[in-house]
């Protein structure tokens, strides 16, 4: 079995964007704009990586806070592929026998929302684990939430050359933890 450590970046609607809810016909936290993942083998060794920009369908213009946080531009998104294609590539890359992991539940929840939005089969929670809770429990015997930055510092893992809030970088940080 492989372990797929994934991270997502997503655009969000402005709070007063009622037309967004009319277009989606459902409440939505945000629209995925980048998928990043690291594949680990059964020995927890990194064997591959995946990254792809997703061209948004419902939120075509970057929210100013998301743009500032991620550095993702409209030009990056214009080079992306539609969500259905991006997710299909991601699934093919994952293979057949794998467990998904993410830092906290936000990424799996936004993925499930976007799968529902695009009428694709949802992820089963049995095939996902919360790396943040695993870290917290094994390191401190608690379920307290710790940031990736805290865990990296705690475990003395260097992140100097990579920036946070890039889906591939964040997945790599989590894989190292």
Regions found by a protein language model. Give the residues of each.
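Metal-dependent phosphoesterase signature
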Residues: 65-86
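N-terminal start-of-chain detector that recognizes signal peptides
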Residues: 5-11, 24-26, 50, 72-73, ...
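Entry/capping segment at the start of metal-dependent catalytic domains
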Residues: 1-43
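Metal-dependent phosphoesterase core characteristic of DEDDh/y 3'-5' exonuclease domains
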Residues: 30-35, 39-70, 91-177
């Amino acid at each position: 079995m492989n372990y797929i450590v994934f991270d997502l970046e997503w655009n969000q609607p402005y709070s007063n964007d009622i037309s967004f809810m009319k277009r989606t016909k459902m409440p939505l936290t945000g629209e995925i704009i980048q998928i990043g993942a690291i594949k680990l083998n059964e020995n927890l060794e990194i064997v591959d990586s995946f990254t792809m920009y997703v061209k948004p369908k419902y939120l075509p213009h970057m929210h100013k806070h998301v743009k500032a946080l991620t550095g993702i531009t409209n030009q990056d998104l214009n080079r992306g592929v539609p969500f259905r294609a991006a997710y299909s590539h991601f699934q093919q890359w994952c293979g057949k026998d794998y467990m998904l992991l993410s830092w906290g539940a936000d990424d799996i929840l936004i993925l499930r929302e976007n799968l529902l939005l695009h009428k694709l089969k949802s992820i089963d929670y049995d095939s996902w684990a919360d790396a943040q809770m695993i870290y917290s429990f094994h390191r401190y015997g608690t379920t307290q939430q710790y940031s990736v930055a805290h865990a990296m510092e705690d475990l003395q893992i260097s992140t100097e050359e990579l920036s946070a809030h890039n889906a591939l970088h964040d997945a790599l940080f989590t894989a190292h933890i």
